[in-house]
Amino acid sequence: MRIHEVTPKEGSTKRRRRVGRGISAGQGASCGFGMRGQKSRSGTGTKAGFEGGQMPLYRRIPKLKHFPLVNPKHYTIINVGKLESLEPNTEVTLESLMEQGIITTNDGPLKVLGDGTLTKALTVKAAAFSKSAQEKIAATGGSWEVLSRKSQQDTEKDE
């Protein structure tokens, strides 16, 4: 077998369409473009979404607000009232709360909210705090520290 004897498998190739070669060829005269008009001329034709001058669909539909975020931030949420069960002067992190069973599911970095009362001084380390949570932790003599989201995600990957 030589290179000039190699042919494609039967039925794998289609004959190309020869347009403008007479009426008997099937694509003669107007070459399959119909009679006149913008779609028969050379060039790009109409833009996508053009409806012939009718008000297009994307302009008929109202502009809706409050679409959901594509990549929303998901936090593991806890209120300061739940931290009341911990011993005074302990360091509170997502890992320590998981170990003690106060938080059962890890939905992402820890966020502390201000619902409930807190009477013990604690050192709380979390990715985010609400204003009321910061005030309640500081009022008891405790401290709070904002961890970066990356540092918390790195510890989650290690586990």
From Swiss-Prot:
Positions of disulphide bridges: none
One GO term describing the cellular component: cytosolic large ribosomal subunit
GO molecular function: rRNA binding; structural constituent of ribosome
GO BP annotations listed: translation
InterPro entries to which the protein is assigned, alphabetical: Ribosomal_uL15, Ribosomal_uL15/eL18, Ribosomal_uL15/eL18_sf, Ribosomal_uL15_bac-type, Ribosomal_uL15_CS
Coiled-coil residue spans: none
Segments for region (Disordered): 1-51
Key words, A-Z: Ribonucleoprotein, Ribosomal protein, RNA-binding, rRNA-binding
Biased composition (Basic and acidic residues): 1-13
Positions with biased composition (Gly residues): 23-35
Domain of life: Bacteria
NCBIfam families: rplO_bact
Biological role stated in the UniProt entry: Binds to the 23S rRNA.
Family: Belongs to the universal ribosomal protein uL15 family.
Subunit details: Part of the 50S ribosomal subunit.
Protein name, entry field: Large ribosomal subunit protein uL15
